[in-house]
């Protein structure tokens, strides 16, 4: 059973919070499916080329079929002609959506959290609020914790804390409702408010 370190105000270990045993029994394939779906949803789908039916011109046969010694041609807009259509090019009418049901999303999150806990890369703190809203205070907190980059998870995200972390390129701050398996997996450490972690454990 994996345990999460609960830190005090001095960022010293005060206690531990156990994750449910079922978090360790999740098939890792659920995480793969969720990450694949999440990344697919980020695709802009803007690349577009014109096919034979879309390119302008080329309706008239450029020369007669036989008798002039050259290769036959039916249109000046085939893909082998300069200015012609593109064969098998990207189109912007593709749908990259990949469905992942709620249970799989939940299982993926549980697996990701359990992996972080096993590697001692998830920390619980009573409060992550930075009332000053200053980036230097947020940077100092991360430096004292000794992590390269971190996902900051608050129970309720306030504007001052968001302002403090916004300019740090090695941190990303969210509230509990935005937490997902991809974000947990992509950051090297997760720092979460104790109340938020308890709500996750309760649901699990």
Swiss-Prot record:
Q: A Pfam family for this UniProt protein?
A: Ribosomal_L4
Q: A GO BP term, please?
A: translation
| Keyword Ribosomal protein tagged | yes
Is Coiled coil there in the keyword field? Answer: no
Which InterPro entries does the UniProt record give?
Answer: Ribosomal_uL4, Ribosomal_uL4-like, Ribosomal_uL4_dom_sf
Q: Which GO terms describe its molecular function?
A: rRNA binding; structural constituent of ribosome
Segments for region (Disordered): 49-75
Keyword set, alphabetical order:
Ribonucleoprotein, Ribosomal protein, RNA-binding, rRNA-binding
Name any GO cellular component annotation.
Answer: ribonucleoprotein complex
Gene3D superfamilies linked to this entry: 3.40.1370.10
User: Can you tell me which family this protein belongs to?
Assistant: Belongs to the universal ribosomal protein uL4 family.
Subunit structure and binding partners: Part of the 50S ribosomal subunit.
Job of this protein: One of the primary rRNA binding proteins, this protein initially binds near the 5'-end of the 23S rRNA. It is important during the early stages of 50S assembly. It makes multiple contacts with different domains of the 23S rRNA in the assembled 50S subunit and ribosome.
> What is the recorded name of this protein?
Large ribosomal subunit protein uL4
